[in-house]
């Protein structure tokens, strides 16, 4: 299969590599011609568990028959159990669950600012990677000098 230009229906937010991926297993992916690649991007760092993991697929399939996602307005017992485990292991008091990296970065910025203000720091400063991608909200885009 020859990879054509990106569909006009897809916003051109990335310069796409001329490869059409079809499937994955662990840290490897295959294109529509059957060529194998090492997935060093992991879905831009959001797919760190790999592709088609034999222990994850059944667990995810089972969860899909129950709840995919629900608002934090409700108690979610498994989420609360995970929070207890994470806080115990990290020595922290609570966790903030997010759906995206943008939410995590935005939340971290807000928490860091609040911490600084609570400590009496007039203008708390936050350390971020320069020219890195932290999300597409105004707060995360203005956290670095990345013009995109």
Describe each region flagged by the PLM.
Residues 1-94:
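N-terminal glycine-rich, Lys/His-bearing helix-loop that initiates the first secondary-structure elements
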């Amino acid at each position: 299969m020859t990879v054509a230009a990106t569909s006009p229906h897809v916003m051109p937010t990335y310069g796409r590599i001329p490869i059409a991926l079809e499937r994955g297993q662990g840290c490897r992916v295959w294109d529509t011609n059957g060529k194998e690649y090492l997935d060093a991007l992991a879905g831009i760092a959001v797919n760190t568990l790999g592709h088609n993991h034999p222990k994850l697929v059944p667990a995810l399939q089972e969860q899909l028959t129950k709840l995919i996602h629900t608002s934090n307005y409700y108690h979610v017992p498994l989420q609360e159990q995970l929070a207890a485990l994470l806080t115990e292991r990290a020595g922290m008091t609570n966790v903030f669950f997010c759906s995206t990296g943008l939410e995590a970065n935005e939340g971290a910025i807000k928490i860091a600012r609040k911490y600084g203000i609570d400590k009496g720091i007039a203008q708390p400063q936050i350390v971020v990677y320069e020219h890195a991608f932290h999300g597409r909200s105004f707060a995360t885009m203005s956290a670095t000098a990345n013009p995109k």
